[in-house]
Amino acid sequence: MKIILTLSIFLICFLQLGQSVIDPSQNEVMSDLLFNLYGYDKSLDPCNSNSVECDDINSTSTIKTVISLNLPTPLQEYVITQDLTPLQNLTYMELYEKIYLTLSFFKNINKLTQLETIVTLSFNVTIPDDTIFPASLETFSIYKPSVPLSIAIFGSNIKNLYVNSPLTGYSIPTLINVNPYLENLQLPVTYYSGFPSNISLAFPNLQYLTIYVNNDMDQNNYHNFSISNIGVFKNLKGLDIEFTDSYNPQEFSINSFLSNVPVIDSLYIYGQGVTIDPSVGIIDLSYVKSKKFLSINIQESSLLNNCKGKSFKSPKKAYFRSNYNTFSYACIDFSNLAYFYDYYNEYEQYLPNIDNAPLLNEIYISESVVVGDIPESYCRINYLGLNYNQLNGTAPSCILCLGGNRGGDIVLPNPLLNFNKTSEPYCPTFKIDQNYTNLVATDGIGKLIITGTNLGWYGNDITPITANSKLAITIPKGVGTNKSITVTFQNGEQRTFNYSYVPPFIKSYGFLELDSNKYLTINGTGFDFENPNIITINGQQITFSIALGGGDNDGLIALPIDELPNFDSETKFTVSTLVGGQSSNEVTFYYFNSINITEEKLVLNNTGGSVDINGSFGTNNISLVSISINGTNCLVTSYTNSKLTIQYPSKQVGDNYVLTLNVGGYAVNLVVEYIEGGETPTPSTTPSTTPSTTPSTTPSSTPTQSPGDDGSTSSTLSISFYLITLLLLTQQFI
């Protein structure tokens, strides 16, 4: 028995030594905090609580440190008076309702140097304006504030500030110092809260702004208010304005916001009370220059209720989505819209007139009080849905062509006079024009473009360019001439089309390194994407790879550099090929081991201008040098083999441009961004040696270790092993 007792004591001691323990100073703080909040036993490890997350201080230590607090609502209100500064590795802190922070916490918050996120669902402490927040703090979420928000919050390094559900006593500073760090701001606004008059200047890098407007006129002492003179948000991408749903909302004009967001991508408006300024009479967003397109989402709003004429105008290719709004389609200027969605609109009316909407590609109107006919003009819409309305007129010919089985998915249920689920396809006007272009690319993305009348929307290998009148038939990879394909149209009609693949065309060459191997690449079109390509270089036939790339880019074929004949620098060599029985052009290139551009990216003015480009160009012969941007030639005004100057053309603002430097057929690409006016920023300087087309490659699968995994056996496994050993030994002595 003595031996058993001794072994048991040894086992307990061993396990205590093998287990990780929390840092003593943190243990004291957390034990007291958890006990006062939830009655948590002070003898227990706080790290074992569901409210606390701990981790090893480092990979070799068994000492635990608190990294996250998630404190749920206690039975009674509690003010955290404990000094939390020992929690030096705390990164995340979330406090539910009835838990309050103190002034002392914020006076010492800069000592929590790894704190990244604070979420507090009850907030009643006035933070001093001289408070310094840690540089690590990125997100501060405040719910139910009942005190003024300190200017220190708005002047910190915080990137994301979210404020919700204000209580009496809440207010916002009316002037804020310039803060380049804040990117996402969410603020409630009431008639008593105030609003920063210089918000656009104070936050020059603000990306997303959400304003919650409390506009309940039934609230005690409530009165009208508005926000104006906010300035221009030069970098704002998203604007979200939401109004408290109310039976008695105030009228709140938002023109001051909507006229100052030149580059937003997203606009969301929710709730009753929002209006168009009667002195302006229109919301004109056509000036907005989104990076891609502007998405407009209006939900349960009074914005367009009493509009007069075309009161809402969007920028080109905008999305417009409406849910539970009551408005006339006459309010909307459709000329720039690409997508229009309207659900649950109780305004009785006909379908919108889209004769002057050339960009409109998609229409979905559902669960709305639209009546009358479906116009023939709707046959050109590529994505169309008119289900669950009250359309009681006639369906157009393109729907009749499909019959109830297929066309019903687009326009039923509706009480149409000439169309229902059992209608048979009727299409006497189905017609295919014979003058289509029958040359297609070899990369499998090539299309036969056909035109006609009532062709439908889809079919096998068919997609719409303009529904019913212009369709694209996808042709598989291949080479050669005199091919054919048979397709079935949406109305069941079958047709066979003849085509040939484009002949090969050689454009340029370059070099590519993959997995420490160097390849010569030849770029062009019409290569074989299924079989190796045979290239003739100076009369010698050499086998290159299957073509890669394609699509919007040229194809690329590759040859290991050690299989290439030896050439001296600037040596001429001729290149040609034969693909699918079709001969390419024969080109003369000049051989260079390397051509590169020092800049990683060029940023140019959209008005055009002059710019220097540095690099190693391999030759002093300017006659071998040409430069273009997306196919538009640039004038080389000055040249050495390490620096050149070009006059570049004007382009629309965007970052999807490519500059191609061609030296004797050796092509190097460089990403180009066009910006609005101003000075051209200094380019970054990572050398570019990219060939004109870079293939997509999949990295080899390489085993990796998880962070902190040094490959050694875990402490849990070691403890388990010794525990089993001790138990086995114990059994021998019983």
Curated annotation (Swiss-Prot):
Involved in the sexual cell fusion of D.discoideum. One of its GO terms (cellular component) is plasma membrane. Residues 678-712 are annotated as: Disordered. The keyword Lipoprotein applies. Glycans are attached at residues 58, 89, 124, 198, 224, 392, 420, 435, 482, 498, 523, 596, 605, 614, 621, 630. InterPro entries: LRR_dom_sf (IPR032675), Sexual_fusion_gp (IPR053133). A lipid is attached at G708 (GPI-like-anchor amidated glycine). It is found in: Cell membrane. The sugar chains may play important roles in cell fusion. The GPI-like-anchor contains a phosphoceramide group, rather than a phosphatidyl group. Residues 1-20 form the signal peptide. Residues 504-592 form the IPT/TIG domain. Residues 680-712 have a biased composition (Low complexity). Its main location: membrane. Keywords: Cell membrane, Glycoprotein, GPI-anchor, Lipoprotein, Membrane, Repeat, Signal. This is Cell surface glycoprotein gp138B. Sequence repeats lie at residues 683-686, 687-690, 691-694, 695-698. Residues 709-734 form a propeptide.
